[in-house]
């Protein structure tokens, strides 16, 4: 059996897959994000529970928020206790088995490239538009991670100067410590903040969407601004990576208005003659991360380092 664990800021999901990568069972529990010892004990306990249920020792793959460096050290995670820790190495010592680990957005991309809507395409770019923004690039079914495992952290690219000037955008401070990261505008949190600044009132993404569908002028202005920012980011990714397909996940990807406007918004920032990639919704949605983690444990992606 193959186990995938998707670690979030508030929850941990463990899923069990058979040898054909068909889902057999899954469950969730709270993330003990402040105490590393409690976190590791929780993971070990849940994996042993899965072993007992399956009657065998399954392979283990972990998807988590943050950058996993080449030596397995986790940095820039929103789960505080994981930063500067070698999670896979430490868990492997507890379990006495190999543990694979990767960034959750990269696992999303891998899942969709190998098993999902990106299957059959050579160059698959996965992109999450949710609480945060990030993704991953798969080439012929393998993750491209880069020299420092940073490939896919495009949420921390700066917003282009022409877009910032055109809309007189405020410089939002990102959780990474920088200002003006694309994530601070195109994530769900960023869109809500953008609407608050334009409308001059406290509101969230849900309030914005309701107002947009009622043809509120300020909501429409927010939408146009948002699509210009997102289109510029997408165009930069098209120029840098030239994917066959861009697979979208996260809550904002399910907003019909955004998905419908995205190709034209991207094209507006590209020179004439450029062929756009296909834009498609993920097949597995929020389950892509845990499925991608199982793929790491399965050993189908040789680009990930394993800790034994």
UniProtKB/Swiss-Prot annotation:
One MF annotation (Gene Ontology) recorded for this entry: metal ion binding
Functional note: Involved in the pathway of N-acetyl-D-galactosamine degradation. Catalyzes the phosphorylation of N-acetyl-D-galactosamine (GalNAc) to yield D-galactosamine 6-phosphate (GalN-6-P). It can also phosphorylate N-acetylglucosamine (GlcNAc).
Key word Nucleotide-binding present: yes
Domain of life: Bacteria
Additional detail: In Shewanella sp., the active phosphotransferase system (PTS) specific for the transport of GalNAc and GalN is replaced by a set of GalNAc- and GalN-specific permeases and kinases (AgaP and AgaK, respectively).
Record organism: Shewanella sp. (strain ANA-3)
Protein name stated in the entry: N-acetylgalactosamine kinase AgaK
Gene3D superfamilies xrefs: 3.30.420.40
GO CC entries: cytoplasm
Positions contributing to ATP binding: 4-11, 132-139
Binding positions for Zn(2+) per the UniProt entry: 156, 174, 176, 181
EC number(s) given by UniProt: 2.7.1.-, 2.7.1.59
Subcellular location: Cytoplasm
InterPro entries noted in UniProt: ATPase_NBD, ROK, ROK_cs
Reactions accelerated catalytically: N-acetyl-D-galactosamine + ATP = N-acetyl-D-galactosamine 6-phosphate + ADP + H(+); N-acetyl-D-glucosamine + ATP = N-acetyl-D-glucosamine 6-phosphate + ADP + H(+)
Gene Ontology biological process terms from the UniProt entry: N-acetylglucosamine metabolic process
CDD domains: ASKHA_NBD_ROK_NAGK (cd24057)
Keywords associated with the record: ATP-binding, Carbohydrate metabolism, Cytoplasm, Kinase, Metal-binding, Nucleotide-binding, Transferase, Zinc
Family under the similarity heading: Belongs to the ROK (NagC/XylR) family.
